[in-house]
């Protein structure tokens, strides 16, 4: 027969063992949760790194697009400036540069400027008068003394400086355009197709001065 004191200690040891088992199980659960948390945290960091990389890629693409846009705008500005410069040369000197594909043989000189820095040119006249060949005076301080609308609408001017072949091409290519829109389209076409590389280089050098 077990004595009461011995039974007490046995019961105490049994209770301690059970408590230790419970603590061990709790520790195991905590370690599992820790492992799960670490895995989740690693996954989160991977997703964060991926997101950061995607943001950087988007930023690089945006900067590339911005640089391309600036380059296109600069190239367009040079081309339009070169077209205007060529028109200025034609209008002031009355003699266009030799064309790359078609020589403008029909071009003739405009009257030279007078001492008052004025020049007489032929235009279609005002829409109300209906007169063609009316002589008007314009100040040469503005080198483009032909306005854009006059260039786009003046048949005598076009016939004076463009060969029939070029006029036919422009009329066919840009029949659906009028006014300033047609001027820009025709100018860009002439720049791309009628200017030699040497002429383009010369005009670009002029624009830098």
Swiss-Prot record:
Record key words, sorted: Activation of host autophagy by virus, Coiled coil, Early protein, Host cytoplasm, Host-virus interaction
GO CC list: host cell cytoplasm
Sequence ranges of Polar residues compositional bias: 116-129
Coiled-coil zones: 39-75
GO biological process, one term: symbiont-mediated activation of host autophagy
Stretches for region Disordered: 103-131
Keyword Oxidoreductase: no
Highest taxon of the lineage: Viruses
Location(s) in or outside the cell: Host cytoplasm
Induction: Expressed in the early phase of the viral replicative cycle.
Reported function: Induces host endoplasmic reticulum stress and consequently activates autophagy and NF-kappa-B signaling pathway. In turn, may induce autophagy-mediated STING1 degradation and innate immune evasion.
Family affiliation: Belongs to the asfivirus K205R family.
Name this protein carries in UniProt: Uncharacterized protein K205R
């Amino acid at each position: 027969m077990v004595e009461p004191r011995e039974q007490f200690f046995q019961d105490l040891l049994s209770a301690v063992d059970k408590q230790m088992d419970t603590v061990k199980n709790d520790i195991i659960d905590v370690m599992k949760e820790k492992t799960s948390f670490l895995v989740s945290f690693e996954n989160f960091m991977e997703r964060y790194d991926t997101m950061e990389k995607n943001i950087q890629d988007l930023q690089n693409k945006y900067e590339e697009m911005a640089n391309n846009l600036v380059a296109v705008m600069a190239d367009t500005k040079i081309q339009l400036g070169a077209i205007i410069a060529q028109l200025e040369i034609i209008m002031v000197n009355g003699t266009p540069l030799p064309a790359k594909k078609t020589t403008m043989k029909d071009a003739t000189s405009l009257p030279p400027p007078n001492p008052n820095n004025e020049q007489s040119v032929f235009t279609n006249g005002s829409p109300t008068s209906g007169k063609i060949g009316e002589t008007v005076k314009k100040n040469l301080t503005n080198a483009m003394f032909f306005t854009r609308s006059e260039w786009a609408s003046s048949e005598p001017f076009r016939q004076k400086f463009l060969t029939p072949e070029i006029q036919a091409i422009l009329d066919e290519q840009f029949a659906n355009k009028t006014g300033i829109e047609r001027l820009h389209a025709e100018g860009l076409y002439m720049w791309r197709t009628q200017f030699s590389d040497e002429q383009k280089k010369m005009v670009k050098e002029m624009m830098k001065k």
